[in-house]
A protein has these predicted regions:
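Loop segments that connect adjacent transmembrane helices in multi-pass transporters
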Residues: 151-156, 229-277, 373-375
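ABC-type nucleotide-binding domain
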Residues: 363, 370-371, 377-628
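Cytosolic ends of transmembrane helices, especially the final helix of ABC transmembrane type-1 domains
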Residues: 233, 256, 280, 289, ...
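Transmembrane helix-loop-helix hairpins at lipid-water interfaces of multipass membrane proteins
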Residues: 1-40, 61-115, 122, 196-200, ...
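Alpha-helical segments in transporter systems
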Residues: 2-11, 59-80, 84, 101, ...
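Juxtamembrane loop-to-helix connectors within ABC transporter transmembrane domains
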Residues: 54, 119, 123-124, 141-187, ...
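A hydrophobic transmembrane-helix motif
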Residues: 77-79, 83, 111, 177-220, ...
Length: 628
């Protein structure tokens, strides 16, 4: 074996290292990621934002860094110790020296395993805390978004952001960053150790590195595409499940189970193919790297064995059996982190892309925000006034046009009109679920835009047609997790709204289980529970939006009795299609195409014989016909 100029050797090493650094830099800086969308944030910006969540746990990361140094030291030192043991065994057998070498190796191994274990435990705990903080902030931000903003984002997409994407980020804190750092130092440390041990054998090992760089670049391309398909397929199936499981009753009513099953099968197969493609990419890359590893081992055994048997001196360095054993271990420890780096850079890109997806949701500015000088509203009498209010969901398509009216405190006002006339929109604007474009809305003479949103809504109680009950118990749904309300007060409210009549018949009373969305209760029972939930929080203004629609006659009588009692609690605003349910209202406002066309009490509107008279006569005749 001929001797090589050390400068040539150093040049080759620098060239290989440069190739690795360029490949790694390209992997991190690539704007196209495994998530399948154009990146808008720089990696540095994402890391800075994530670092804010990691900063409270900086001391823990410093401890992990120290423990990581011990693990790196083991990877670099252990082959030297084993090589020395081999030389002791192959040469003059000295039991004392051999025992000392084995003891040192065992001690280093145990210490390394202990530090690795502690490192893993600390990282898992800290990583989960960081992700828990991030997930809570994300959920809190989603809660702050306006209704119209939430309507623009599929629920399945939000679920994916809160679950899958945050889990991808957790990998970065619990494993990726530390492993990337460790593997980089291990590669450099082993490279230096091999150079010090034998230049030419090191050069032989480095001859295989350019092939790894090429395989890594190719792997990164196909792996990114596979990950993109997998992420998109996962999001698609989550969105589909969220929508169709919520509407499964409609599917069953119209007998569309087979069609929906076929749609789901296609999406499920798409997800399966994406998983298979990702597995295939990894199953090809790993054997290729392993092939290079085996090839380098064979070259080591051949060249090293030839040098050892022929007692050849390489640049003044004699190859001993200990050197061959040491290089054998170094090659294994050298190729393993290189293989891991390629995959870890790819997963890092996926984690950064997931972080950008999460931050893209958190960067959505709520359209309903408190003014800088917004005030707290401690008490509300319930006086409401609309002054020339204009509102549109879509620019240019006005839903309300110059609406003006006044509601005195403790008055009951009903809004009637055809579908799309703007009745429910008025109630939504009062609670600031949407922002109106023109005019003013006043509560007790104060512009609602000058009141803190949380403070404003605290004085409103909303009872909607589609009552939403949370999984839990009847008690938890009435008090809404507000501790300190005694059962006696809860039952008093239930009696007030006639909900006690069915609660007392239940086996567990207030502790009766409420399934998802309250599906184990009838529509009327859910409505009575919503009345109790509203009354117990003592609102100053009560809003009923089609609260008596689709209710059986017996339950409607109970609800009507409850409404009569609730009129004494505070101001009441009602939207109803059944005109018979609002005859008691102090004022009835009739809307058409976003404008008020009639208003007055029931008798006044009948005497006018206008549109309200026509609607009432039509409904009355229909009821008479049904009774006959």
């Amino acid at each position: 074996m001929m001797h090589l100029n050390p400068l040539v050797l150093v040049g080759a090493v620098i060239g290989v290292i440069t190739a690795l650094l360029v490949a790694a830099y390209a992997a991190v800086k690539d704007k196209k990621t495994a998530m399948g969308f154009e990146r808008n944030m720089e990696d540095g910006e994402i890391m800075r934002r994530l670092a804010r969540y990691a900063r409270p746990y900086l001391s823990k990361f410093l401890i992990v860094g120290v423990l990581m140094l011990f693990s790196i030291a083991y990877d670099i030192i252990s082959p030297l110790i084993v090589g020395r043991i081999e030389e002791l065994v192959a040469g003059e057998f000295e039991l004392r020296a051999l025992f000392l070498g084995v003891s040192v190796y065992a001690g280093v191994l145990v210490f390394s395993m202990g530090s690795t274990y502690l490192q893993a435990v600390i990282l898992q705990r800290v990583g989960q805390r960081i992700i828990s903080d991030l997930r809570e902030d994300l959920f809190s931000h989603i809660e702050s978004l306006a209704h119209e903003q939430l309507n623009e984002i599929p629920v399945g997409k939000l679920v994916t952001r809160v679950t899958n994407d945050t889990n991808a980020i957790s990998m970065m804190f619990t494993n990726l960053l530390v492993q990337l750092t460790k593997n980089s130092f291990v590669i450099l440390g082993i490279l230096v150790a091999m150079l010090c041990l034998n230049y030419e054998l090191t050069l032989m090992v480095l001859c295989f590195v350019p092939f790894i760089v090429i395989f890594t670049v190719i792997f990164r391309k196909f792996s990114r595409r596979a990950n993109r398909k997998l992420k998109n397929a996962t999001t698609d199936i989550n969105t589909y499940l969220s929508e169709n499981l919520s509407g499964i009753k409609v599917t069953q009513i119209f007998g569309r189970e087979d069609e929906k099953m076929e749609d789901f099968r296609k999406k499920s197969q798409k997800l399966a193919r994406a998983n298979q493609e990702q597995i295939f990419v990894f199953s090809v890359f790993r054997p290729l790297v392993y092939m290079l590893y085996v090839s380098s081992i064979l070259c080591l055994f051949y060249l090293g064995g030839m040098g050892h048997l022929n007692n050849v001196s390489f640049l003044g360095q004699t190859i001993s059996s200990g050197t061959i054993v040491t290089f054998y271990m170094y090659i294994s420890k050298f190729f393993t982190p290189i293989q891991n780096l390629a995959e870890q850079f790819n997963w890092l890109q996926s984690a950064l892309a997931s972080a950008e997806k999460v931050f893209s949701i958190m960067d959505i500015q709520p359209r309903m925000q408190d003014a800088p000088d917004a005030i707290e509203l401690n008490e509300v009498k319930g006086e409401i006034e609309f002054r020339d209010v204009w509102f549109s969901y879509v620019p240019g398509e006005w839903v309300l046009q110059g609406v003006s009216f006044h509601v005195d405190a403790r008055q009951t006002v009903a809004f009637v009109g055809s579908t799309g006339s703007g009745k429910s929109t008025i109630l939504s604007l009062i609670c600031r679920n949407y922002e109106f474009q023109k005019g003013q809305i006043l509560i007790d003479g104060i512009d609602i835009r000058k009141i803190r949103i949380s403070s404003l809504r605290r004085h409103f109680g909303q009872m909607l047609q589609d009552v939403f009950l949370f999984s839990g118990t009847i008690r938890s749904n009435i008090v809404l997790r507000e501790e300190g309300i005694p059962d006696s007060e809860i039952m008093e409210v239930c009696r007030y709204v006639n909900a006690d009549k069915f609660i007392n018949k239940l086996d567990h009373g207030l502790d009766e289980e409420v399934r998802e969305r309250g599906n184990n209760f009838s529509a009327g029972q859910r409505q009575l529970l919503s009345f109790a939930r509203t009354i117990i929080h003592k609102p100053s203004v009560m809003i009923l939006d089609e609260a008596t629609a689709n209710i059986d006659t017996e339950t409607e009588l109970l609800i009507q009795d409850s409404l009569e009692k609730m009129r004494t609690v505070g101001t009441m605003l009602i939207v109803a299609h059944r005109l018979s349910t609002i005859q008691h209202a102090d004022n009835i406002i009739l809307l058409s195409h976003g404008e008020i066309i009639e208003q007055g009490n029931h008798q006044e509107l009948l005497h006018q014989k206008g549109r309200y008279y026509q609607l009432y006569t039509l409904q009355y005749n229909k009821m008479q016909l049904q009774e006959s």
